[in-house]
């Protein structure tokens, strides 16, 4: 043996040196362990499980993804939370449905959720519950490209939704049908959007146009659209008015009607596809105070009292959010469910999942997994009382 290129040493000397080095290392390790914080076993309860490629259902794949990481894990967890909602008794499930998803082929998924009562209330942009009518009329949308020459599309009367094309003539035909339907409504009655869309949905059912609001009306599922005029409905309201048939919308009555839902349920679960007005409207149900229950709270509900204000709030027990927006810009679409806890809108002990993903990817996968996984028929709450005045 040679140490540091010096004179050879005997094996016994080499062993002694190595033994000394080992003792020094062991002593250093003991000192490190004594001075370092102990790592709790709770950090290591659930191992990440690698996904094996084999034939499997969507439900099984998402179950395996929930045991991995990043947004794949969150997508799998979203299925778990939704499944728990469906299986819980005395729960109202509200979906906030933002953007222009119907033009992207998502509207029949919403119909299925309504028919099977995996949602009890839909809060939607006007776009989602109007642009689906084009497709339901048999007209449809077409795959295009976002590299289009938009000036040429304008000349050809083609409307572009990112990589989807729609005919302007089809849109006008939808608006005409919508106007005809709205002109069957009473001129002297102040409608909420839920009442209006219920009556209009019945009209579409008679026309065999199986859109979202038609399906909802057939199953007594309320559809609220707080910003309904920001869509083809706004155009249809104007056209009806110009033909001597003005429609009255009462947004204060609408909000009071929505808040009253919280007085007739034990717990609430929410699913947000995107954010915007639909999300905020549904979130307000947790904290909005009705004069009817201001002093003593809602009987039968586990409310929390803001002692300084002497007001009750009722955080949503379950929550799912599918979004591509980020929280640091301050907008509601990217606002985390954890931030909503500070407002009293989301239950600190409830089940929740946030997945940052394009909804056209997440929604079909989640709903197909639910279809495979949940075998019980849900006993859904009866919300037909909301339509009592217009039935």
Locate each region found by the language model.
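N-terminal glycine-rich anion-binding loop in soluble enzyme alpha/beta folds
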Residues: 39-86
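A generic, well-ordered mixed alpha/beta core segment in the N-terminal half of proteins
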Residues: 111-173
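C-terminal functional extensions of proteins
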Residues: 297-391
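Ligand-binding beta-strand-loop-alpha-helix segment within the catalytic cores
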Residues: 152-233
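Short acidic, glycine/serine/threonine-rich loops at helix termini
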Residues: 105-108, 133-139, 234-239, 282-285, ...
């Amino acid at each position: 043996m040679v140490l540091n290129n010096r004179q050879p040493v005997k094996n016994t000397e080499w062993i002694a040196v190595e033994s000394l080095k080992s003792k020094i290392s062991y002593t250093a390790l003991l000192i490190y362990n004594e001075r370092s914080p102990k790592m709790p076993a709770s950090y290591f309860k659930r191992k990440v499980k690698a996904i094996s490629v084999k034939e499997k259902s969507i439900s099984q794949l998402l179950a395996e993804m929930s045991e991995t990481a990043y947004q794949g894990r969150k997508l799998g967890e979203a299925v778990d939370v939704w499944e728990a909602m469906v299986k819980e008794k005395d729960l109202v499930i509200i979906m906030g449905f933002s953007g222009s998803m119907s033009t992207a082929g998502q509207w029949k998924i919403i119909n299925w959720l309504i028919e099977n009562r995996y949602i009890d209330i839909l809060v939607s942009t006007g776009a989602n519950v109007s642009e689906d009518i084009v497709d339901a009329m048999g007209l449809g949308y077409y795959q295009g490209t976002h590299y289009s020459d938009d000036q040429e599309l304008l000349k050809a009367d083609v409307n572009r939704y990112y990589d989807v094309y729609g005919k302007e003539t089809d849109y006008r035909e939808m608006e005409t049908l919508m106007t005809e339907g709205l002109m069957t409504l009473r001129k002297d009655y102040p409608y909420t959007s839920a009442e209006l869309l219920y009556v209009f949905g019945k009209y579409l059912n008679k026309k065999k146009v199986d859109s979202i609001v038609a399906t909802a009306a057939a199953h007594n599922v309320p559809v609220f659209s707080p910003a309904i005029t920001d869509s083809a409905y706004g155009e249809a309201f104007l056209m009806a008015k110009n033909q001597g048939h003005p429609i009255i919308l009462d947004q204060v009555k609408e909000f009071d009607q929505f808040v009253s839902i919280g007085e007739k349920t034990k717990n609430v679960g929410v699913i947000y596809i995107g954010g915007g007005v639909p999300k905020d409207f549904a979130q307000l149900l947790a904290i909005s105070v009705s004069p009817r229950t201001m002093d003593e709270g809602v009987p039968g509900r586990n409310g929390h009292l803001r002692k300084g204000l002497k007001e009750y709030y009722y955080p949503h027990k379950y929550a799912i959010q599918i979004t591509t927006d980020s929280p640091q810009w301050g907008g509601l679409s990217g606002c985390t469910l954890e931030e909503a806890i500070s407002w009293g809108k989301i239950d600190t002990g409830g089940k929740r999942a946030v997945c940052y993903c394009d909804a056209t990817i997440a929604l079909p996968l989640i709903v197909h997994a639910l279809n495979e996984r949940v075998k019980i028929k849900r006993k859904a709450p009866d919300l037909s009382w909301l339509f009592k005045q217009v039935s």
